[in-house]
């Protein structure tokens, strides 16, 4: 008994020990080491054994092997043990520069690459969206695109002498502001906590109080109610409260969602005033980070449009900036000019998609409706839509353009100032 107790005590002490930079806890909850990544893999041994014996593989064998491989691909980290490396961040780092340089060789190659690239990204989006899984592919593509375009602007466009120091500084400030707002957007979107089960909606409803009303005497209202009426009223309120709680109850997070909150199946959490899950930031957009998300879009679009104008003015000096994308003779004469022109086209495609996203966001905020509420209302046919579904008005929370924008800009402050003591 003493030996058993000592062994259990030693195991508990081992678990409580801090992981070194090369250690980690695997998917089975066991302590492992990066150096042992090629050791003791029963799933891989079973697959190889069946292959050599020419026996049929189990249906789940390959998925188990891939799970083990992805779990063991880690990099040493200074604190918290070795970190898992998501391989989905690698393709953008390799394919984006290769495809852009390939497209710069000839006009037809540019058309082929710039047409196929958005199609491949959309295919991968629908593929991952159907599986409801998280991926760093889109965040990696967004960050690397921003960094790589800035690198080419500094290394290829600026040395040509057509861009001044002030213009370079303006682009640098725009990139910095975009990254700062993106970092802030990546924080907590407003996750519904266990102590927020009774949080009410931040939407304020206004009603006029009659000046001359016989039921109001000096601010006091006389109400007469019999015992039977009180019992009936209490039962009715209890049934309504129970029905509301059942409707807003999240069986996954085990919390009662406040009004306008929603559950994200990708992140696996409930978010206050959930708008949508944005794959480009690998995070939800909710009450706490919606304003910073909008600022990120604005800063990026302003920087991108300004940078595209500077690039086209440099590589197509004889053409108008508005028409240079469609007609720029002699741009493929020099490889450097062709590469800058190709990158300008790539940025224009990305900018066009984000302009559409910004337009949808502005319209939804003006009508005080989230993207999630708009989709649900269109599916249930409970909203008015216009402009081919671009404008969706549910008529539930809208209180006018100015009030809707005021509520949107201040909803993050209400979330920070709220506490369990002032919630009723």
Q: Predicted regions span which residues?
A:
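Interfacial segments of multi-pass membrane proteins
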Residues: 283-284
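Eukaryotic intrinsically disordered and solvent-exposed regulatory patches
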Residues: 169, 235-237, 250, 265, ...
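Short Cys/His-rich Zn2+-coordinating modules
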Residues: 227-237, 245-251
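Short, non-ligating residues that shape and space the ligands of small metal-coordination modules
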Residues: 259-262, 273-276, 287
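Hydrophobic alpha-helical transmembrane segments that serve as membrane anchors
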Residues: 2-211, 287-424
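Short, flexible, mixed-charge glycine/proline-rich loop motifs
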Residues: 237-245, 254-258, 270
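Short cysteine-rich clusters marking metal-coordination/redox-active sites
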Residues: 250-253, 264-267, 278
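Long, low-complexity intrinsically disordered regulatory regions
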Residues: 209-230
């Amino acid at each position: 008994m003493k030996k058993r107790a000592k062994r259990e005590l030693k195991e508990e002490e081992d678990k409580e020990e801090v992981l070194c930079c090369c250690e980690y806890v695997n998917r089975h909850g066991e302590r492992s080491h990066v150096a042992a990544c090629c050791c003791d893999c029963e799933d891989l041994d079973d697959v190889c054994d069946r292959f050599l014996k020419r026996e049929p593989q189990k249906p789940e064998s390959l998925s188990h092997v891939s799970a083990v491989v992805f779990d063991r691909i880690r990099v040493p980290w200074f604190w918290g043990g070795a970190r898992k490396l998501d391989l989905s961040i690698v393709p953008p780092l390799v394919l984006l520069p290769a495809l852009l340089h390939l497209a710069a060789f000839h006009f037809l190659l540019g058309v082929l690459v710039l047409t196929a690239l958005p199609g491949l990204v959309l295919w991968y989006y629908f593929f991952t969206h159907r599986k409801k899984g998280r991926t760093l592919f889109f965040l990696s593509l967004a960050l690397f695109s921003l960094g790589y375009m800035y690198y080419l602007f500094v290394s290829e466009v600026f040395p040509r002498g057509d861009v001044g120091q002030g213009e370079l500084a303006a682009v640098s400030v725009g990139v910095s502001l975009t990254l700062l707002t993106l970092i802030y957007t990546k924080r907590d979107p407003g996750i519904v906590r266990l102590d927020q089960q009774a949080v009410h909606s931040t939407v304020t409803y206004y009603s006029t109080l009659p000046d001359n009303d016989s039921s109001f005497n000096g601010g006091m209202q006389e109400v007469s109610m019999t015992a039977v009426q009180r019992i009936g009223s209490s039962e009715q309120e209890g049934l309504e409260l129970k029905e509301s709680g059942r409707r807003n109850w999240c069986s996954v997070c085990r919390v009662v969602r406040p009004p306008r909150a929603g559950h994200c199946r990708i992140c696996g959490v409930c978010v206050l005033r959930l708008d949508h899950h944005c794959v480009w930031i690998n995070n939800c957009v909710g009450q706490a980070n919606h304003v910073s998300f909008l600022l990120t879009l604005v800063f990026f679009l302003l920087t991108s449009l300004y940078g595209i104008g500077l690039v086209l003015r440099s590589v197509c000096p004889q053409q108008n900036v508005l028409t240079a994308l469609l007609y720029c003779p002699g741009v493929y004469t020099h490889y450097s000019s062709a590469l800058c022109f190709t990158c300008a086209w790539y940025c224009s495609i990305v900018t066009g998609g984000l302009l559409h996203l910004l337009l949808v966001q502005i319209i939804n905020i003006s009508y005080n409706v989230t993207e999630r509420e708009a989709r649900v209302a269109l599916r249930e046919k409970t909203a008015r839509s216009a402009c081919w579904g671009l404008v969706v008005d549910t008529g539930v929370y809208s209180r006018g353009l100015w009030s809707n924008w005021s509520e949107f800009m201040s909803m993050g402050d209400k979330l920070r100032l709220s506490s369990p003591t002032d919630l009723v």
